[in-house]
């Protein structure tokens, strides 16, 4: 059994709107295979606004 790890940081705010849905897709061609997402991490930061009164 072969195991692969994919790790990539993508600056999504350059490509997608503020609200999105994320999904996964995988294929092996004509052969059957089971794909499992064993962990998932998502981090989001909103740019804050500051005001001085």
UniProtKB/Swiss-Prot annotation:
<dbReference type="InterPro" id="IPR013320">
    <property type="entry name" value="ConA-like_dom_sf"/>
</dbReference>
<dbReference type="Pfam" id="PF00139">
    <property type="entry name" value="Lectin_legB"/>
</dbReference>
<comment type="similarity">
    <text>Belongs to the leguminous lectin family.</text>
</comment>
<dbReference type="InterPro" id="IPR001220">
    <property type="entry name" value="Legume_lectin_dom"/>
</dbReference>
<dbReference type="InterPro" id="IPR000985">
    <property type="entry name" value="Lectin_LegA_CS"/>
</dbReference>
<keyword id="KW-0465">Mannose-binding</keyword>
<comment type="subunit">
    <text>Tetramer of two alpha and two beta chains.</text>
</comment>
<keyword id="KW-0430">Lectin</keyword>
<protein>
    <recommendedName>
        <fullName>Mannose/glucose-specific lectin alpha 1 chain</fullName>
    </recommendedName>
</protein>
<dbReference type="GO" id="GO:0005537">
    <property type="term" value="F:D-mannose binding"/>
</dbReference>
